[in-house]
Every structure is written in structure tokens, then in C-alpha cells.
Amino acid sequence: MSDRMRFSLVFFGLILSAAIVMATSSTHLFQKPSTEPELLIIKMAVSREWDKIFEIMYLHHIVTGVLILSFTYIYPSIRDFQQGFDVFSVEYLPLALFGVYGFIVNFAASVAIKKWMKWYIEKG
């Protein structure tokens, strides 16, 4: 598989994951469109639909974490495996650890932001 085709597949995957996140987070998709253009997240914040905002944050951070893991470990190891390298060696451990670290930090950030927002809302 050529590098151009790999790039196309990765780019298509990014667009597809963004579309999935937008489609699953939009509760107003099938309702009558408003006359004023507004961002969905602003609509939800104004109407105090905090749980839906948190769902969007979780989805965003999970997708970002998976992309970090993919670009730091999965994609390079597939490429190197096809060229005959041993991708389960110790040399690839830092890449795997960095990818897992990025995923965990992204998810922890969304949990921390959710807790902070709940505390801020309850405080008044």
C-alpha cells in the first residue's frame, strides 16, 4: 500500500470519527432548524443541558485519545511490521507507552473538567 493511500485512509478515518461524534452528540438533528445560526454546544449551555455537554466532552476526549494512540503506536507498528520489523520488541515500548499515556490523560482531563463544571454549577 502506498504512502498516499495510507494518508487517504487515515484522513478518511479522521473525518469519519468527527462525523460520528457530531452525529451522536447532536440531539437537535431531526428537529426543525432555528432561524438563527447557533452552535449546538452554546444551545445546550444556555438551556442547561449539562449532561449532553459532558457526553460530547467524553466522546471528544475518547476519539482524541484513540487518535493519539493510533498515530504514535498502531500506525507506525503496522507500517514497520509490513516491512519485516519485530514490532513487539522493547524498541516500540516508548511509542506504546506514549500512546496509552495520551489516551489516559485525555480521558482524565474530561473527568476533571466535568467535576470542575459540576462544582462550579452547584456553587452558583
Swiss-Prot record:
GO cellular component: plasma membrane
Keyword Transmembrane helix tagged: yes
Compartments reported by the entry: Cell membrane
Membrane-related topology note: Multi-pass membrane protein
Chain ranges passing through the membrane: 7-29, 56-78, 91-113
Keywords assigned: Cell membrane, Membrane, Transmembrane, Transmembrane helix
Name by which UniProt lists this protein: Uncharacterized protein AF_1757
Native organism: Archaeoglobus fulgidus (strain ATCC 49558 / DSM 4304 / JCM 9628 / NBRC 100126 / VC-16)
